[in-house]
Amino acid sequence: MKVSTLRESSAMASPLPREMEEELVPTGSEPGDTRAKPPVKPKPRALPAKPALPAKPSLLVPVGPRPPRGPLAELPSARKMNMLAGPQPYGGSKRPLPFAPRPAVEASTGGEATQETGKEEAGKEEPPPLTPPARCAAPGGVRKAPAPFRPASERFAATTVEEILAKMEQPRKEVLASPDRLWGSRLTFNHDGSSRYGPRTYGTTTAPRDEDGSTLFRGWSQEGPVKSPAECREEHSKTPEERSLPSDLAFNGDLAKAASSELPADISKPWIPSSPAPSSENGGPASPGLPAEASGSGPGSPHLHPPDKSSPCHSQLLEAQTPEASQASPCPAVTPSAPSAALPDEGSRHTPSPGLPAEGAPEAPRPSSPPPEVLEPHSLDQPPATSPRPLIEVGELLDLTRTFPSGGEEEAKGDAHLRPTSLVQRRFSEGVLQSPSQDQEKLGGSLAALPQGQGSQLALDRPFGAESNWSLSQSFEWTFPTRPSGLGVWRLDSPPPSPITEASEAAEAAEAGNLAVSSREEGVSQQGQGAGSAPSGSGSSWVQGDDPSMSLTQKGDGESQPQFPAVPLEPLPTTEGTPGLPLQQAEERYESQEPLAGQESPLPLATREAALPILEPVLGQEQPAAPDQPCVLFADAPEPGQALPVEEEAVTLARAETTQARTEAQDLCRASPEPPGPESSSRWLDDLLASPPPSGGGARRGAGAELKDTQSPSTCSEGLLGWSQKDLQSEFGITGDPQPSSFSPSSWCQGASQDYGLGGASPRGDPGLGERDWTSKYGQGAGEGSTREWASRCGIGQEEMEASSSQDQSKVSAPGVLTAQDRVVGKPAQLGTQRSQEADVQDWEFRKRDSQGTYSSRDAELQDQEFGKRDSLGTYSSRDVSLGDWEFGKRDSLGAYASQDANEQGQDLGKRDHHGRYSSQDADEQDWEFQKRDVSLGTYGSRAAEPQEQEFGKSAWIRDYSSGGSSRTLDAQDRSFGTRPLSSGFSPEEAQQQDEEFEKKIPSVEDSLGEGSRDAGRPGERGSGGLFSPSTAHVPDGALGQRDQSSWQNSDASQEVGGHQERQQAGAQGPGSADLEDGEMGKRGWVGEFSLSVGPQREAAFSPGQQDWSRDFCIEASERSYQFGIIGNDRVSGAGFSPSSKMEGGHFVPPGKTTAGSVDWTDQLGLRNLEVSSCVGSGGSSEARESAVGQMGWSGGLSLRDMNLTGCLESGGSEEPGGIGVGEKDWTSDVNVKSKDLAEVGEGGGHSQARESGVGQTDWSGVEAGEFLKSRERGVGQADWTPDLGLRNMAPGAVCSPGESKELGVGQMDWGNNLGLRDLEVTCDPDSGGSQGLRGCGVGQMDWTQDLAPQNVELFGAPSEAREHGVGGVSQCPEPGLRHNGSLSPGLEARDPLEARELGVGETSGPETQGEDYSSSSLEPHPADPGMETGEALSFGASPGRCPARPPPSGSQGLLEEMLAASSSKAVARRESAASGLGGLLEEEGAGAGAAQEEVLEPGRDSPPSWRPQPDGEASQTEDVDGTWGSSAARWSDQGPAQTSRRPSQGPPARSPSQDFSFIEDTEILDSAMYRSRANLGRKRGHRAPVIRPGGTLGLSEAADSDAHLFQDSTEPRASRVPSSDEEVVEEPQSRRTRMSLGTKGLKVNLFPGLSPSALKAKLRPRNRSAEEGELAESKSSQKESAVQRSKSCKVPGLGKPLTLPPKPEKSSGSEGSSPNWLQALKLKKKKV
């Protein structure tokens, strides 16, 4: 016990650093090196000890187990837990004892067990030297201790494999007591399941670990990195199972034998591959690995591992491990230490594993020869897998899960994760939380699930208590690991959901949670481990590969599966080998799953896993470069395994294998890089992507280094991944079919990966990769944090969905699920998935969602939740499901678009196809728009016809947009997607929009806004057909007009799909830009895209001029798309277009004019276009240009909305990239679509616009108003509005179109009506709320306003409510709407909160300007001054959208100032202003609204304000959308920075007026002098406590009223003190003392302007000089000074004492200089006072 305690203490002290090393090291090669080195040293120790295998191994067994404690002990929590649990139970003695007695009790290897017990005891005695030395060594190299222990484990394992099996079986028996003991000792120490619940489970897990696993685990933990990491992983993973099951024991015994006997070195070494492979096994079949070994033992493992390796490999492994122990002794020291040690920690943070695979590869290469042996050890494990298979048979579903970790390699890997779970969980409990996250994720999923399915593991169950308990404990622990883990950030979000989700939603979450958790783990694991994610995050991978089956299987087995997540975390190590592993695993898993798909049972799962583990070793070995041979060997072996499954589903397998492997590879890249971080991500992604893509299984693994292969295979759509990529492309609107090559790992992976995430995965799943990119776009924080943030925002599910979705989606969805589900759908058609999706949309939609992994499960799980759906592809698949159902095919097609398109596309289905994905969205938007546009204007009619659908679709779509934006926003991918933002955004938005739109809109909108929209492909759109081939490809898709459409569609789709990628590409151009730029760009780009979209749309709408302009618009928009998107040129360039269009493009009535106007508008809008550029420039610009083209008002409306949207949009835009993100998206969607439509409609004829607007707007409204629609539901306001607006819009649209010419007066007035439309747009501007609100106010503005005004008001009840829930919507509405209604007092009020927030904080201002403008301006003035107001509104609209309105800044500034001044009145004033100067105001606000809005919103939007100051015009907008704003703010935070860039780009980020206006609050501070005085007073106040109340009051009141008040009461009796600082002179009159003090201080203070220090001194000196006379003179001078000094004069009269008192102070002060005066004054004061 003492020894154990010592060891633990040492381990805790020493291993903690070790763990730190692990934690830190896993990031680089160090984990392996550092670990390897220290373990190597201990290993010799162990090796000397090793000779006495019987005795010392027994001793070493305890020692071995102790080291794991050491690592755990390393953790602060371990120590803490030691205290809590007690070092003794914690000590190797007690911990091993539970196992030793069990092995002893378990007479299977009675001698061995006894020996082992003896070993433990001997080890207890012996370990003190070893352990303390090891631990001592451990501090330097924490793994040193583990090395000896590991060799101990090796020795022990060699002798005690059977023993271990028996012991493991016995531990199961003893698990109850042992776990209790473990609970006491290991619980705290373990911290596996967060300690007592899970830890006990892992305490249970630790039991075998103690014997074998603990030796391995401890050895692994301490020396584990050298030897035991794999073994420990296996055994640790096994450990739960070993403890849990005799089968596990047997399995682990098998493994432990091989591992214990030879595993120490061999496992250490082979297990590195094994660890990677185990990680893979654990990762790929991590869950499957166990079942693979359990069930796989029978089905997969038997045919692969069990027969070949169970017996032979057992001996062979023992033998091989013995030799390998020698080989691995050095190599494992390094390899295990690095890969294994790194894997353990890397399990958590082995994302460095990508680097470590380099290390691991070198290290694994050493095991290269051993890796085959490792494979055999795998096989060895797989014979144990046979035991786990009984586990499965035993009904140990969890044991399957556990078995998954338990799977030899899986267990090695599981031990990497599970062990990290025990170890790392303990570590995280101890503060160093490396793997715990993963492990806990696994455990979270696994343990939470384990207790569920782990009925036979009573001890485990008991330790777990309930799933929930474990989950909670996990959650708690996860909280620990979350931060520390390399994946800590991920873990933070990801792990807790797993436990929580898994536990709470064990069954549901088993399915969805597996997807989510697995996905999350995939996000973590998968991201951390990419491939390992699929294999490792077998839950994820299963969710991916087996999503239907595994999702279901893991529903049944999913509880076990959550362990997969736990294991999937572990696959992070697998990331080394996981690429290959996932491939094989994907292959195998897919194979298994294929059969399993039908059988969704643990056994089939196991079968899958059996094959997978077999494959996984290869994968694990593939992790290292050297293991490529082993990988090939295993690939061959797994290939047989694969062959079996392949036989089952050769094609599916191949596809699954290819796709899943590649997906996993991508995920691996995506996942793997994630922990390492973005920097490693790309390389890692490439490497990993390259590695898995070779779908040849072994060949692919062999080609593990074939990034090109991966890309090429992906490009080739090798297997499912290719399809998956295509699918992802489709899903993401990435036309992957043609592009798989481009998109493929390299293009797609990098582009799409980044774009989609590798996009989704990347965005969420692999911030390192796509997310990093995406994060770069969005900001890494945004990528990961943002993703998480919005995921969190969206909900954990989202995050997990995001992780899962992004990743699972990307990976699972793409390959795994796609494979699994798409397999169902025939996802190969996935490119065709657009169609296939479309056709299979339902199957595939679900499947896709399922495919998207996150989709199905999550879809199922989150299906309503659009979070998952949306999230997964999630985001929009989710949305897709919601909206996606109609949009689903679209979105599926596009993933989101096609789905959407599918729905909308029903109408525009062909188009969507034709359009392809983005046609979905585009087709949705573009569909009708396209249709409209396609038909040109005729399509408008179509669009008009579609409006209902569009309205629905668009609304839904846009809503989806908004909400979908939310969703999209929700999904990093969504953001990433942009398409999703478009499609997804609103797909769910539509679905979720209603409830989620608000909430999602907040997240979604904001995210959608900024993320999806901005992210989406706005940049992509920027890339728009130009930048992005897919878009452009779609352009061809769309053909020319389509090209224009496609251009914008491209822009749209591209932006969404391609744009997403383009955003990656173009967006990549401006990653930040992508985020921000995407927001801005996205807005711009989006709008640019929409600009493009609009342009082309307009082009479609106006084939002639519009096409020209559209071309101008499109092209320019395109270039603007990139300019704008890229540079924000859109603002300028795009603005030009926008202006072009908007500017008097009359709605691009005159393209030339448009250009001219464009320039004007560019100038105007350019100004604002900088700001509005996002707004206008972005959508406004584009759309403003489009709008300007007929929608300057629209630009105003849109731009306005853009600005407003940007600003207002914040409201609608979730303001995100400026609210435009949402607004952009939303707005772009809405506005864009709507605006587009509006622009088109308005331009196209207003009717279309009306329809579009009305419908579209309604749609838009519907979208936002989806909230609104839903909110006000209002189809009324919408419909009403639509009619009103539609009519108005229509007519005005027409008028506006031409007359709108923007300018206002004419059609603008109309367009005011149009503006109603525009307002509608402006209304839209608020996005949803804006749409509605603005619409309400804006749209008919007066009518609509009235129409909507009531509705707006009503809406505002709703919008308010919308704002509440729409926040984005309502916020929009409220702000916009509020603004509108805000204009309308209700709205204003509502807006006032917003506005009050700062007048809508600028949004109100801006949106208010918008809304108010609309409402007021447009609404009120609109009727009053339709032309002007419209103009104003337009101006206003222009102001936001239409910076042209900005040109009239005079009013605008005045207004702004007025606004500023009339903070309260602001709304009213604004209303008035809006009516009169609103245009100017707006204009200024346009510039300033973006800024003011930003600023204005800024106050309201405190969160964003931080970064919002500049960009927060948008943030402001974001703020505008209260909820949205919050989300937006959150996302702003995510994207805020990017957006910040964007906003700044956007023009005056915040105008001074805007800011001041925003920060009217500062007015109080205007008295800084007063405050200074106050400060002085405060300073001197201490001296002059006594203040003459009158003087103090008067003088201070005057000089510093606050001070006077402050001091008055306190120093009321004393007149001298309070005023002294500020009003020293003032107080002179009060009393000489006071006066002198004051005078003296007055000299010092120079408080009074009247008196300079010299004057005061001169006056004071005379006073000082004339003491007596001075008294009179002083009184006089005081009076004079009072006259001279305001303070004095005021105070003298007030005091009335001056005559009498002054002499005193005079004398008191002293007659010398000011210095003596004040000194004397002080003295006298003191004396007299």
UniProtKB/Swiss-Prot annotation:
One of the record's GO molecular function terms: cadherin binding
Compositionally biased region (Basic and acidic residues): 117-127, 230-245, 858-872, 1012-1021, 1389-1400, 1602-1615, 1665-1679
Disulfide topology: none
Post-translational events: ADP-ribosylated by TNKS1 (in vitro).
Swiss-Prot/TrEMBL keywords: ADP-ribosylation, Chromosome, Cytoplasm, Cytoskeleton, Methylation, Nucleus, Phosphoprotein
Listed Basic residues bias regions: 1577-1586
GO CC annotation, single: adherens junction
Compositionally biased tracts (Polar residues): 1-12, 738-753, 803-812, 1043-1054, 1406-1419
Biased composition, class Pro residues, residue ranges: 364-374
InterPro entries for the chain: Tankyrase-bd_C (IPR032764), TNKS1BP1-like (IPR040006)
Modified residues (N6-methyllysine): K1644
Region spans: Disordered: 1-151, 184-450, 484-603, 657-880, 897-1083, 1240-1302, 1362-1561, 1575-1729
SMART domains per record: Tankyrase_bdg_C
Phosphothreonine found at: T131, T239, T501, T833, T979, T1282, T1518, T1563
Chain residue ranges for the region called Tankyrase-binding: 1450-1542
Annotated localization: Nucleus; Cytoplasm, Cytoskeleton; Chromosome
Residues modified as Phosphoserine: 14, 178, 221, 228, 287, 301, 429, 435, 437, 494, 498, 601, 672, 691, 695, 712, 724, 744, 762, 806, 836, 851, 872, 877, 882, 893, 899, 920, 936, 976, 983, 987, 1004, 1008, 1013, 1024, 1029, 1054, 1073, 1091, 1103, 1133, 1138, 1158, 1178, 1248, 1253, 1297, 1328, 1331, 1383, 1385, 1435, 1439, 1450, 1452, 1473, 1476, 1503, 1506, 1533, 1545, 1558, 1620-1621, 1631, 1652, 1666, 1715
Region feature Acidic, mapped onto this chain: 210-1572
Tissue specificity: Detected in testis, ovary, lung, skeletal muscle, heart, prostate and pancreas, and at very low levels in brain and peripheral blood leukocytes.
Keyword tRNA processing set for record: no
Biological process according to GO: cellular response to ionizing radiation; double-strand break repair; nuclear-transcribed mRNA poly(A) tail shortening; telomere maintenance via telomerase
Low complexity composition-biased segments: 46-63, 352-363, 500-512, 524-541, 572-583
Pfam families in the record: Tankyrase_bdg_C
Stored PANTHER family: 182 KDA TANKYRASE-1-BINDING PROTEIN (PTHR22042:SF2), TANKYRASE 1 BINDING PROTEIN (PTHR22042)
Name of this protein: 182 kDa tankyrase-1-binding protein
Organism: Homo sapiens (Human)
